[in-house]
């Protein structure tokens, strides 16, 4: 696949990603947060952004952080709401990869907002710690 979603319990990431085909050039959408479910216990990343940790596990992939700041039931609901469309944030270091993820976000009915590189946007939408998790925002048409 050209675009791969990664949404796995944080401590299971290394095992889930081990032994998979070459990542080179693929887009990996990091939909993870550094918590241990179901207790929502934060994982200490020593000041790193979680997407940097994911990038280390998918060498050569173009990582875009997205689909992680809203609960699953909100993501599964109709993106049209209150006279507008629900907002999804994304960030990444590769402009072409971000453009492809933005197109996917639009195609499924959401409004995408680019938060810049992973070092900035990843921190903004990372749970815990960022100000954007669970912010269910609507862009009015």
Can you describe what each PLM-predicted range is?
Residues 85-141:
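Active-site-lining helix/loop region of Rossmann-like oxidoreductase modules
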Residues 23, 46-47, 80-84, 130-133:
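Short, hinge-like loop/turn segments at secondary-structure boundaries
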Residues 3-6, 59, 106-113:
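Generic secondary-structure signature for well-ordered alpha-helical cores
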Residues 1-38:
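Rossmann-like NAD(P)-binding element
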């Amino acid at each position: 696949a050209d675009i791969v979603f990664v949404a796995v319990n944080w401590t299971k990431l290394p095992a889930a990603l081990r032994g998979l085909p070459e990542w080179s050039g693929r887009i990996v959408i990091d939909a993870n947060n550094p918590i241990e479910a179901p207790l929502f216990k934060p994982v200490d990343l020593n000041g790193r952004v979680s997407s940097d940790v994911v990038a280390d596990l998918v060498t050569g992939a173009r990582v875009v952080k997205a689909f992680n700041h809203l609960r699953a039931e909100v993501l599964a609901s109709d993106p049209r709401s209150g006279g507008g469309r629900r907002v999804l944030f994304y960030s990444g270091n590769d402009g072409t990869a971000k453009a492809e993820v933005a197109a996917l976000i639009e195609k499924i009915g959401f409004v995408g907002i680019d938060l810049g590189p992973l070092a900035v946007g990843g921190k903004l939408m990372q749970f815990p710690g960022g100000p954007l998790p669970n912010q269910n925002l609507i862009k009015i048409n």
